[in-house]
Amino acid sequence: VSSLADVNKTPNWLDENGDVNTPYNGVEATYLPGVGSGSYAGSFNGGFFGQTEVEHPFNFYENINASNSQGVDMSVSATGVGTNGYATALSLLSNKDEYSFNLLMLPGVIDQETDHSPVVSQAIQLCEDRGDCFLVYDNTNLTDAVSDAKTNTEARNSSYAATYYPWVQIQDATTGNFRFVPPSVVMAGVYHFNDVVGQPWFAPAGLNRGGIDSAVRAYRKLTQANRDDLYDSNSNPIASFPGQGVTVFGQKTTQKKASALDRVNVRRLLINLKTFVASSSRGLVFEQNTSNLRNQFLNVVNPYMEQVQSNQGLNAFRVVMDDSNNTPETIDRNMLVGQIFLQPTKTAEFIVLDFVVQPT
């Protein structure tokens, strides 16, 4: 999804039966979980090459499964287009020179579905291998309980992925009908809004940046105990508050080990920094490996790190690229080595206030 406007256009694709409106036929493929590059246009309906549109009506507000394939063959076979089709798409996205993106979502692919789980596994592996993108995935069906979300989330362990619960209801702008969609459909807009009004290293959650304006209501209204149970299992709750609408109220990754990287904002901070440093370093390749080259790197990276620090992304940092890590042996191996030490800022997720009544 390229902008928040694209997310808001989603309901216009549907008629009152939930099928694709004729004027949008062919356009929807741009936003479905496929990729387009040259002759490759996605994994739908058996077409790997030259196919640019979905050929049958679909209900985008429903999850894809064995009994409701929505035209997507999710079978596993050497020539099939199901998990192998998604595998082809994800393999293409592994080419960092060809594709540049920082968020990956697979609407309609539900992790708990047998045929979908390998797709989610490959998507997580893709993000970990690239190191410059983050996955938001779905792991529950519409009617699944809180306990299902907990169990399914606990089966994953990655700081490059996050999942949310429950599904939310959006309105078809054309007909006024209401449709339930998996969280990944609306989370694209939440992340986009967070980055526009804040920074990528801010938490895409809470009343200031986590509101889901397109959502009418959540499928389940979670109690505080529900939210706590979900958060303990690294599943991010979507809450409903009186007068404040539907709001994302969590920002954990699925990483099990407690560290700074078990939070979405910290992982996305590192993704942002890695992307900048990698881009800045590309022009240094094949230059003379002298102190001038090291200073050139420091003169680009340090100001950017200071900017991130001033925008509340870092408490402290230190960039080391000198004789201590660029020894004569290192230089003889045609290598330039740098180390970046970071102290990321943390979010306030629990506010404790003590009221003390004092005597007059």
Predicted region positions:
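Structured, hydrophobic secondary-structure cores that serve as assembly/anchoring elements
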Residues: 1-360
